[in-house]
Amino acid sequence: MMELRVICIIRLVVACVLCLCIFIRSASSATEGFESIACCADSNYTDPKTNLNYTTDYRWYSDKSNCRQIPEILLSHRSNINFRLFDIDEGKRCYNLPTIKDQVYLIRGTFPFDSVNTSFYVSIGATELGEVTSSRLEDLEIEGVFRAPKDNIDFCLLKEDVNPFISQLELRPLPEEYLHDFSTNVLKLISRNNLCGIEDDIRFPVDQNDRIWKATSTPSYALPLSFNVSNVELNGKVTPPLQVLQTALTHPERLEFVHVGLETDDYEYSVLLYFLELNDTLKAGQRVFDIYLNSEIKKEGFDVLEGGSKYSYTVLNISANGSLNITLVKASGSKFGPLLNAYEILQARPWIDETDQTDLEVIQKMRKELLLQNQDNEALESWSGDPCMLFPWKGVACDGSNGSSVITKLDLSSSNLKGTIPSSVTEMTKLQILNLSHNHFDGYIPSFPPSSLLISVDLSYNDLTGQLPESIISLPHLNSLYFGCNQHMRDDDEAKLNSSLINTDYGRCNAKKPKFGQVFMIGAITSGSILITLAVVILFFCRYRHKSITLEGFGGKTYPMATNIIFSLPSKDDFFIKSVSVKPFTLEYIELATEKYKTLIGEGGFGSVYRGTLDDGQEVAVKVRSATSTQGTREFDNELNLLSAIQHENLVPLLGYCNEYDQQILVYPFMSNGSLLDRLYGEPAKRKILDWPTRLSIALGAARGLAYLHTFPGRSVIHRDVKSSNILLDHSMCAKVADFGFSKYAPQEGDSYVSLEVRGTAGYLDPEYYKTQQLSEKSDVFSFGVVLLEIVSGREPLNIKRPRVEWSLVEWAKPYIRASKVDEIVDPGIKGGYHAEALWRVVEVALQCLEPYSTYRPCMVDIVRELEDALIIENNASEYMKSIDSLGGSNRYSIVMDKRALPSTTSTAESTITTQNVSHPQPR
């Protein structure tokens, strides 16, 4: 009997142990792949609400001096009371998390309320996910869904104007279905809603994927439903938990959910709608409804019960900007109105490829080698995330190669580094320039493989020993090698170096490195003279030659046309940056000039603009930065510095500035005719019909101003905010490009420049620039193409008050242009007042400017030439019409000429002018 009892006890213990093991394994399996990081937490802990284990972030950032405590008002619902502040001058700081390649993940950053001025960006790898900005006293969460491209991923915080910060970072595996239509994209969460939810948030362990379902309040027009449901088969791996689905909204006729404040650029959105029929008495066909997204029907006759289950879900995609409207409308013949339990909205962002994997692994290996002897080195601490993309690492420069970036330059000079030169530097196969000078490196110089692409190596001013490796001297592409001021190195390589063509200091400490200008001065002068001479000859020939234009719309006939010569030889001043006189004004003087800011003439992103008069009687526009300005000191300094260095007839000159008592003021000449926007479709008091020749002249003037910026000596300038409101008109209607607060110097060859501050205005913004964040002059070209369409059509670039198909000027106009129906887009105010060839030149240029890929867009210099040709055609046609008028002919502005070619002045043939509509030539 005793033995039997013992056996029972043993079996009971074994059963308990097995149950415990199964429970532990089940719990472990449920959280497999979870990464939960509590930034600056005192220690690892278990969250009492979710029972998830959170670890501190000290394995990434051990410095506790940058830890801050979350404001007390926000502590009630938090387990981690701290956050990490990254006090950095520039760049990014990243958390590298382990992943499984090709697994889909959710990644979520939590950012505590800091201040109304919060503004910085976050990214997944090299793909910008969004901006952290908050004006409400609450936490902000940014969440993205992505497919892991490798076995780890970077989540980065990128500094803009303020130091970035973060309190929590969470990584969760997700089902594959989330990316079924966007396998190569990152999906940014816009909204995840538990309709009529009772609890604030539903997440893990109720939701095994730890999605956070936000409860929404019940709209006054809708009816809430709530039932305790069980034994429901929920098919689909993206299905919400049953606790979310047991509440719903319904209405006898329609449900509508409007999301405003979305980004104004076109993005694809994925909308996931979840339905669970809560009325057990309903049968299939009794609750049928149509589903619309932004008034576009996506599902017709949708019936939750049609498949025999009470549960159903659907995934819908749509392109939208600014807002997204989900509407469910009762179908004809249905007994009951629509129902919805929960939904998600995700924005699809293009995945930006990271640095070449080989280069990435090598430089990360090199960083680890350097850190062994340089634990607190400032340069190495700043090396975080991707070395090339979204703020390249200090000392690193990259170039594009086969769709990804490769490291071509490594400059760690004067970085206070010690220890041996990392051997991994020899594994950087695309490296061309290596500069490790002015450090404390010791030991031997590593050997480089003959396949190395190095063209310049500088190892001078270190503590290196031994002999210069033969492998370096014999590198096939090397043309400069400096290793002087290494007192322990042997200098017996002079003979070998003499036999090569390498520029070198021969290892001597007193040898001066030849400057590029000194070495190549004669060659540069000679080559430059030849190139300039050739350029002038070619330019003269191209501008003076007779152009043969094929007019496809007129039977394919060819008409020779003599093109006027419009060019000027560059003066010597054009090759040097001029110092323009910009006068500093006192605040007292500004207040006197504006009569205490009496006359307000405009408002902009920088602030208010007032009219004033200087002592000499010159009328001026005074731009005063407001306290709520979206632009700051950086934009003020940017415009001041730029306009102090440039001057051109078609750029608004800066007369002076004031920077006193926290006031930032810029002073310009007053432009009496306002802006191009005012004249085309501005306020009625400012609006005035511009005839076609005047519009063409304005377009040409603005193009010349932009071309001057793009060909600026030394380094071209990109405006970044080209639009009709930034093209001002003086008393003679001369166009002047204005507002240089966002302007930047163009990236030079070899730079790996990415601007997270994607600047511009909705309707004008280059989509390629926005998606890739790669800035170039062609971004201005795209915006100028929109301006040309404004000039032709008299319409604004975006107007959501028009029918949906006409919201975007570009998307509305393109089909008409491609169908050769340009008359359909021409401003009614100028119809009949233009020459067909001149108009087509402008329209064709606009279409080329609006090419989706910047490679296919023309440069501003080419645009200037095309517009010059168009103006010549228009002016010559006008002169011809004047001669007709003098003979008693018809008014030129009531007709359209039926030929784009100009009649010869010596021709005695009868005039071919007609008042009938003409067939326009096909766009080239």
Curated annotation (Swiss-Prot):
LRR repeats lie at residues 406-428, 430-452, 453-475, 477-498. GO terms for molecular function: ATP binding; protein serine kinase activity; protein serine/threonine kinase activity. May be phosphorylated. One of its GO terms (biological process) is nodulation. Residues 1-29 form the signal peptide. Keywords: ATP-binding, Coiled coil, Kinase, Leucine-rich repeat, Membrane, Nodulation, Nucleotide-binding, Repeat, Serine/threonine-protein kinase, Signal, Transferase, Transmembrane, Transmembrane helix. Residues 595-872 form the Protein kinase domain. It catalyses: L-seryl-[protein] + ATP = O-phospho-L-seryl-[protein] + ADP + H(+); L-threonyl-[protein] + ATP = O-phospho-L-threonyl-[protein] + ADP + H(+). ATP binds at I601, G602, E603, G604, G605, F606, G607, S608, V609, K623. SMART domains: S_TKc. Its EC number is 2.7.11.1. One of its GO terms (cellular component) is membrane. The keyword Coiled coil applies. Its main location: membrane. Pfam families: LRR_1, LRRNT_2, Malectin_like, PK_Tyr_Ser-Thr. InterPro entries: Kinase-like_dom_sf, Leu-rich_rpt, LRR_dom_sf, LRR_N_plant-typ, Malectin-like_Carb-bd_dom, Prot_kinase_dom, Protein_kinase_ATP_BS, Ser-Thr/Tyr_kinase_cat_dom. Residues 361-382 form a coiled coil. Involved in the perception of symbiotic fungi and bacteria and required for the calcium spiking. Part of the perception/transduction system leading to nodulation or mycorrhizal infection. Belongs to the protein kinase superfamily. Ser/Thr protein kinase family. This is Nodulation receptor kinase. It comes from Pisum sativum (Garden pea). The lineage of its organism: Eukaryota, Viridiplantae, Streptophyta, Embryophyta, Tracheophyta. The gene is NORK.
